[in-house]
């Protein structure tokens, strides 16, 4: 009867799922995924595992996190029905507002971890897959955090989590200063650590008992420099020696050594730095875990800069290069 047919129609269910029977692109980056990955397709029920989405299990995406889903069954947001989930690590993150440098957008970089042991010639340190960071100056005011998908993030200063905001959201800077800012998209927590100073450390291995430190000047965009510094090269029994690295001191007392990738700047690298692409790279170490001379650079053949003034420039951003770098020159 027409009534029975109507009841069957009312009871009939469908599920809204992935376009493939199995989610084969789940471990690919967002840029590499099939363009239809998040599109919603309407299916009649057959097998409970068919046409399901997966997270990136290889990267433990979303493990220990809470997830939000948005289902867009309209053509307002896209030509096709869409699924949006909040646990994916974004491809790009920016900060912008009245509190940021020149009120311009500040791009956060994939974070470089802070190491707790000295380096080695074969040191291989990659960027954190789910943590974004920047070194920047913030003024008293507001700023927003957005990602490549146009999502806004709201920081909770009480216990340091953050979350996707349902509407455009701003965050407040209570104290102007130079900061290291890091957002962990796996734990959904963040850190803001104020930087007290960045110094050049210069002390040869021998013949110079007292280390020389000189405060560097913040230049903006995560860069520091020092110019016309009287360079120290020791002389003893016909030998010469030079050593340097950089010390970042935070207001809370924690110190990072921004240093060379290996525990010692040995002959081949010291003699031909141009042959080693990571020679001028800056690596981050817990300063308290290292001996005094660990992970220090030397100048060319321990002789460069004798009787000259030195200029150093630090780039703790990915604008100058893909890695954190420094440059040096003598005149």
Please report, for each region that a protein language model flagged, where it lies by residue.
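Aromatic- and glycine-rich beta-strand/loop motifs that create alpha-glucan
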Residues: 10-41, 88-139, 149-161, 195-240, ...
